[in-house]
Amino acid sequence: MAMIEVKNITKTFGDLTVLNDFSVDFEQSGVTVLLGPSGTGKSTLLRCINGLETVDKGDILVDGLSVNNKKNLKQIRTTCGMVFQQTVIFPHLNVIDNLTLSPMKILGMKKAEAEDLALHYLEKVGLADRGHSRHNELSGGQQQRIAIARALMMNPKALLLDEVTSALDPEMTREVLNILESLAAEGVCMLSVTHEMAFAKGVASRIIFMEKGKVVCDVPKDEFFGSVRNENERINQFLSFIGE
């Protein structure tokens, strides 16, 4: 059984159908990059997996638990940590307190254990000296790295990454991509919506290209950037448009 099973889901916003009878499975391994033009349902798919959006039809199972049952959402959100395009760091808390809040409240972790774990992940993302900093003392890249550390604090089986570098300048983008590349090398499972082709080419094991709420192709990375691009005019057009 796949870790995440998306079963024939449809999601609409008013008259707009964003995901149309959409199905896909994700195993607990590798890095899957979701590509496609804006508005084709990539971010909506991640939000549906995490239970932040409800589906109109179909179902999503995360470790066998249905997102349609609200009682499962706490466990599902622990299983799938999500990092957003716009970082949400509580401004009234320092970095350590931002990282320890959920493990203490949701997992029942003791304060000392949570703080030790927070220091471990801050070191992993290269911010060991920022534990007592607050929101306004951090750059955008630092905030995103802290958001990644906060997601890892819950020991998720997968990270859902929703265009986490799109609001950053090139230098900050590289800071964040370095962390994601390091996590991928450690075997952390990731589902990423991104337009960073360097990340897709360097780290992804699987590429899913979406358009009009459906899967156009679902192939290994090397095949996507090789034979699929050469043979599929639409995908070649998309990659050329974004400068790849």
Regions found by a protein language model. Name each.
Residues 133, 154, 186:
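Conserved signature/switch motifs of ABC ATPase nucleotide-binding domains
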Residues 50:
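Helix-to-loop junction immediately C-terminal to a conserved catalytic motif
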Residues 159-162:
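Catalytic Walker B motif of ABC-type/P-loop ATPase nucleotide-binding domains
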